[in-house]
């Protein structure tokens, strides 16, 4: 490898590390053109590290599933466990998004559909479990390209270390819905 190629690779590696640090350094995501403010890049970084992932969103769109699919698959290959709870609130979830997830990830992901017809279902949260702590993203982003990137969506991340009481409330609410108010897809 020529010296110029080595220098270019180092520059690209340093640039990637700088961008990753910028992305990871915020707990507030508001969407827009600045990728540091886009939830997508935060989720990708979290997926790369998590031992398990719990996602609860009111709807899934094929555009968003396509964006996350490779990293979800990589996490599963690493041994991470992934659970997804979604719904058909307002009839927005695209069947093609569900088929795509099932086709690519199969039974390796525990995917469920919220199953109460008399109660609205509109949560948007991504819970990442690591060794020793957990992160939760809560906000307005469902899984669609716009919601994960340039759309104006407000999301906030906090950890089980910084706010254990509220983290536990959200996590237990997820567990209750997932185990007792859903059907397996």
Predicted feature residues:
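PLD/PLD-like phosphodiesterase catalytic module centered on the HKD motif
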Residues: 1-185
